């Protein structure tokens, strides 16, 4: 599957599907492509991983929100929580979602799969960073680097949690499977359920000689410089994830994600309104009367615009496609130029004479039509 499909399409649900609808859709698809039902079928196995990846994202409110905002780009190019490049291992999928299959249809989803057991795979916690972006960054997308303090794999035990090679023993409660199985008789017949082993907490092993540096946790505090790409069109408060760059998990689990929260830096000239940009242009009285050309700043430089003779304060000019791109790639906003006329608070004697001459000119006397036009615009603004 060279190109990722839409996750809602993968599960066959609408974009406003409820949690129950997602769970039912995932269960149906996963059973359809389950390896026990399709032994040796690589295509079915890939579909099985794909539906697990889709459910992992859409069943998590935060990941789903990022996916709805950014698409696959908001998940660091892959699904969150361990779906890296082509998906989780089969063992990871069964560990995370296997409880959805318990006692259903004759197979619980936990067959050996070539010798693997359903040991619990822990996940490291997510990290959050706030990244400030200029409008120029937002207009084109940008590469960023952040230095974070986080949990990393223990440098002494390499994440194993033991002081020496033979520092673990197989859990005697679950015999290394990480789960305990219970069989109960119901009117439908014998039902088998599985739950996490209470002794080893799903790991299948007990540490007898913990690492002296990490005390058996398999992690320590370290630093990492993380690089990531922020797509064009993001907005204040939006979030995206960098897959697997959060805290390391205890004893060889799945890393958490780095959650990047977008913060917009104020621009000295432009004001953002959705994907449109607004520039407040202040022109002189003579320019408003005579008309002429002026330059205005844009997101990528400057643009020359024409001021028509008799331009009124509040007139809005539009520069097509000079705004910001949509984060989902659907079109580009415009730049709006809000024209205002500068009225000086004081003038010198020479200017007073010029103003006095204009007062007697019919050209400078307000007309009833002009007043009605202002009245119409004001009423439209109030509606």
Swiss-Prot record:
ZnF bounds (CR-type): 141-223
CXXCXGXG motif repeats: 154-161, 171-178, 197-204, 211-218
Classification via NCBIfam families: DnaJ_bact (TIGR02349), PRK10767.1 (NF008035), PRK14289.1 (NF010882)
J domain ranges (all copies): 6-71
Protein's UniProt name: Chaperone protein DnaJ
Single Gene Ontology BP annotation: DNA replication
Keywords carried by this UniProt record: Chaperone, Cytoplasm, DNA replication, Metal-binding, Repeat, Stress response, Zinc, Zinc-finger
Entry domain remark: The J domain is necessary and sufficient to stimulate DnaK ATPase activity. Zinc center 1 plays an important role in the autonomous, DnaK-independent chaperone activity of DnaJ. Zinc center 2 is essential for interaction with DnaK and for DnaJ activity.
Locations listed in the record: Cytoplasm
Highest taxon above the source species: Bacteria
Family affiliation: Belongs to the DnaJ family.
GO MF entries: ATP binding; heat shock protein binding; unfolded protein binding; zinc ion binding
Gene Ontology, cellular component aspect: cytoplasm
Subunit field text: Homodimer.
Cofactor note (record): Binds 2 Zn(2+) ions per monomer.
Protein role: Participates actively in the response to hyperosmotic and heat shock by preventing the aggregation of stress-denatured proteins and by disaggregating proteins, also in an autonomous, DnaK-independent fashion. Unfolded proteins bind initially to DnaJ; upon interaction with the DnaJ-bound protein, DnaK hydrolyzes its bound ATP, resulting in the formation of a stable complex. GrpE releases ADP from DnaK; ATP binding to DnaK triggers the release of the substrate protein, thus completing the reaction cycle.
């Amino acid at each position: 599957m060279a190109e990722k499909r839409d996750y809602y399409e993968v599960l066959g649900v609408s974009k406003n599907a409820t949690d129950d609808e997602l769970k039912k859709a995932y269960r149906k698809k996963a059973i359809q492509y389950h390896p026990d039902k399709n032994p040796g079928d690589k295509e079915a196995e890939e579909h099985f991983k794909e539906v697990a990846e889709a459910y992992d994202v859409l069943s998590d409110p935060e990941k789903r929100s990022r996916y709805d905002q950014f698409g696959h780009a908001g998940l660091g190019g892959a699904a969150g929580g361990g779906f890296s490049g082509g998906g989780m291992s089969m063992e990871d999928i069964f560990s995370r979602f296997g409880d959805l299959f318990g006692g259903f249809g004759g197979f619980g989803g936990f067959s050996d799969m070539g010798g693997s057991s359903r040991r619990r795979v822990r996940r490291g916690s997510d990290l959050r960073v706030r990244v400030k972006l200029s409008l120029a960054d937002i207009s084109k997308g940008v590469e960023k680097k952040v230095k974070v303090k986080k949990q990393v794999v223990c440098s002494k035990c390499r994440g194993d949690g033991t002081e020496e090679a033979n520092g673990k023993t197989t859990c005697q409660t679950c015999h290394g499977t990480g789960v305990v199985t219970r069989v109960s008789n119901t009117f439908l017949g014998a039902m088998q359920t599985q739950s996490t082993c209470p002794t080893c907490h799903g790991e299948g092993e007990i540490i007898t000689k913990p690492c002296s540096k990490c005390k058996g946790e398999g992690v320590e505090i370290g630093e990492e410089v993380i690089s990531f790409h922020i797509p064009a069109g993001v907005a204040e408060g939006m979030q995206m994830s960098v897959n697997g760059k959060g805290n390391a998990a205890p004893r060889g689990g799945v890393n958490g994600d780095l959650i990047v929260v977008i913060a917009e830096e104020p621009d000295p000239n432009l004001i953002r309104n959705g994907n449109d940009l607004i520039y407040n242009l202040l022109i002189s009285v003579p320019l408003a009367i005579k008309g002429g050309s002026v330059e205005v700043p844009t997101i990528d430089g400057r643009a020359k615009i024409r001021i028509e003779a008799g331009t009124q304060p509040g007139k809005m000019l539009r520069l097509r496609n000079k705004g910001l791109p949509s984060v989902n790639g659907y079109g580009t906003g415009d730049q709006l130029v809000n024209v205002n006329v500068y009225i000086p608070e004081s003038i010198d004697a020479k200017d007073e004479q010029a103003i006095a001459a204009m007062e007697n000119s019919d050209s400078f006397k307000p007309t009833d039509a002009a007043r009605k036009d202002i009245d119409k615009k004001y009423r439209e603004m109030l509606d």
